[in-house]
Amino acid sequence: MAAPSELQLYPSVIHPAIQKYWDEFCELPAETLSAFSSYYPDILRAFAVSDFLALNILREPELVLSFLQSSQHQKECQLVDFRAPLAEELSGALKEDDLLRILRLFRRRMMFRIIWRDLVCLVDYQVTTREVSWLAETCIDEALSWIYRDMSQQFGEPHSTAGVKQQLVVLAMGKLGANELNVSSDIDLIFTFPERGETQGGNRSLDNQAFFTRLGQRLIQALDNTTADGFVFRVDMRLRPYGQSGALALSFAAMEAYYQEQGRDWERYAMIKARAVAGDIDAGEELLTSLKPFVYRKYIDFGAVQALRAMKEMIEREVQRKGQDGNIKVGRGGIREIEFIVQVFQLMRGGRDVRLQQRNLLSTLECLEDEGLLPVAAAAELREAYIFLRNLEHAIQGLEDKQTQEIPKDEEGRERVAVAMGFPGWGACRVQLDKYRDCVSEHFADIIAERREAPLERPDTIEWKALWAGRLAQDEAQDLLLRSGCDQAQEIYEAVTQLRQSSRVQHMQLQGKERLDEFMPNLLQSLAQSRASHETCRRLLALVEAVLRRSAYLALLNENPGALTELIRLFAESAWIARQIVTTPLLLDELLHSGSLYTPPDTTALRDELRQQMLRIPNDDLEEQMEALRYFKKAHVLRVAASDLRETLPLMKVSDYLTFIAETIIEQVVDEAWETMVKKYGEPGYEDAALNDMRFAVIGYGKLGGIEMSYGSDLDLVFLHGASGDLSTSGETSIANQVFFTRLGQRIIHLLTTKTASGDIYEVDMRLRPSGNSGLLVSSVSAFQQYQEKSAWTWEHQALVRSRAVAGCPGIRAEFEKVRKDILTQHRDPAKLRTEVMDMREKMHASLGTKPDSSGSPPYFDLKHDRGGIVDIEFMVQYAALRWANEYPQIVVWSDNIRILEALGDAGVFSQEDADKLCDIYRLLRAHGHRLALQNLPARIQTDELLEERRWVVAFWEKVFAE
């Protein structure tokens, strides 16, 4: 059967897609086709605008026909229209498989109805978002009720210590909280409960925390897990206190304490839309009322502008990094900018004007207009733009029922989106989109965006343009370079000429070539004026070559002359930094923000920044998570290196920050790995059923453990767990605890070490675990303790001196620290200890020390391994710690060499003068090592350098190990 004549109403580029679905549709029985005949125009439109609708029509034609004949597509639903039918269907669910199947089929039916009405009937977007929100709310609440009843049969019902019955409260954040959920969106939830206590009336009792955690886990699985019937909603729990490392469910008291003591500005922003959607709704709303002082300040909070500005800046960096200019949510002039405009007024003035304490954006926008906080015209323009962008968002997502805000890259996809929006084609739609985005961007700049200085007018660059274009003779070009302050004119001229004549430059596309022709004169002039060497020029030209096919970076430098100045300075001072930026040009973005470039954030800010970045990545997008972690590390290590070069950070702070970066990443990786494993296998079984936290910890050894990391340090790690190996996990696919923790450890290593296009994050060395490479990847704390007491070699106890817990469960970390203290403070035979430490040092020196050259003398001094170097000092520290910690346990409180040396001086083991001298030399040697690392050079110096210090260390070694 030929397609109806209405096919000609659609752009020709999408005819093949419509025809394909139409041909399959025509294979339905004649009786079915006849029943559909009066709906052919709508069916054709559905095929044109949505693969999701088309596939459901072909999969379940009878259901779709019933939907159309009952006129459900012509009327709005109320909340009861979702709740009543789902509650009835679930009343017959006898087991969890029934629950999962019913939820998914119900979601599919209702989502078909909603998307049909949105894209075929073109209903108001607010109707669509309200109905999607009601669907989600219904699925959450009904699933929670079913699982609660099921668990109560086994454990009884939770009660407070005063005997009051308790229920879980599910808080919806973001779009769901505001009843503004998209047609294909995940749901951001937080689980909480009123009071601590325990269950009553079941076969065995659980404390409330454990009960509600298990309840929450099962609820997530019921909604999020993908089965043969699909999923219900993707669930994101990362907005809860402490993020992925936090407890899945917290009491009201713990929630209030967290937000009062540790709440961040971006969490205030997130809490604006929070709403209780399931469980004890009344109690949930009482909790949110108690949290309002955290969100809305009594004074006019001008600091909110800067906080949102920082959030927007972070998002802009990600948009640039990921090339998301076509993203209508986070891109320029997108939905997020409108949200920020509205929410900055809410955060600033909501404490003084309760009318602004609303969840719905358009309602709040109306209040801002009424209160005179936004001009009438601006409010109208923002409202119109917001509605357009939200409708466009639905059109994009409705194509395949996928959570995306990216304009389709292919022509067919764009045309289908335009049709869904009611336009004759993408051209007309794009004109309207650009108009709205320009308008939003203008208003955002007026209200929130930080004013940036216009690029400085450069002096006349005619000569430099002529040099780059090859219009100057060689002697003229070299004379220009010399006159401008460059004393290696010939080498630079030859390098520039070679680049200009290269095939890669000759075959550049027009836009890229124009950007290069604008950039190169500026670069050459800046190089000459900074008296840059040929080596600096070579490094910068390597960068230019690296970005020839990604000329947006050249545009960035053209528009930001200050960034070019910083670039030349850093490339001149550090070969290592130059190499980092050449291999990862995305780091150029860091140069735009000189304030943060030379002031690395503290540990709290580091964790906060990484958490915000990871929150914007879907839970199941492992590739993007890994890329984000790699960029985070590189960007922050670059900041440390820049500060190191400028000497705004002393040596110890450099190592501190490099260590903080590693710890922050490890914490995030552990949380990501744990969440993935628990989702797949359930939580490990514990002999104490009340335990429900991670019970896993990462121990750092070596440079990480000693808080002494350098730019190229790897991670020496040991993994410990606190669960019985005889028990198994709680998931449907259950595995033994030991298998679970082994796979968890493997996944952590995989996330840290897998090489992507951006490289790895860190190299990981696990050889310091009990029994080394032949031992278990993850040991229990008790097995670790037994090994250290009965089997460990002296060198392993030396390594333990520089160890500390860096991530994971606080309880397991505390257990490790106790084991460490007990082992290090044991009494040891001094003579045996002395012999074993000296023997190990001799072996290391024989293996790693510098060998004499043909003249019989060493050609250089290895800062780390040669006599009088870093390892000698570390061995003396470890020997003294093991020798004297039994008598002076304060010696091993810390794991870093400097503080151990200070403790040895305070205890009188070393004289104060000797301890101070060793600290000074240790810092000096490490500072030389850092400087060499920043030049991509090995840790070696000339044999006549630092002679006095090296000889002093050798002499002190003899004194320490004298019999």
UniProtKB/Swiss-Prot annotation:
Disulfide bonds: none annotated. GO terms for molecular function: [glutamate-ammonia-ligase] adenylyltransferase activity; [glutamine synthetase]-adenylyl-L-tyrosine phosphorylase activity; ATP binding; magnesium ion binding. Pfam families: GlnD_UR_UTase, GlnE. GO terms for cellular component: cytosol. Its EC number is 2.7.7.89, 2.7.7.42. The keyword Transferase applies. Involved in the regulation of glutamine synthetase GlnA, a key enzyme in the process to assimilate ammonia. When cellular nitrogen levels are high, the C-terminal adenylyl transferase (AT) inactivates GlnA by covalent transfer of an adenylyl group from ATP to specific tyrosine residue of GlnA, thus reducing its activity. Conversely, when nitrogen levels are low, the N-terminal adenylyl removase (AR) activates GlnA by removing the adenylyl group by phosphorolysis, increasing its activity. This is Bifunctional glutamine synthetase adenylyltransferase/adenylyl-removing enzyme. The lineage of its organism: Bacteria, Pseudomonadati, Pseudomonadota, Gammaproteobacteria, Oceanospirillales.
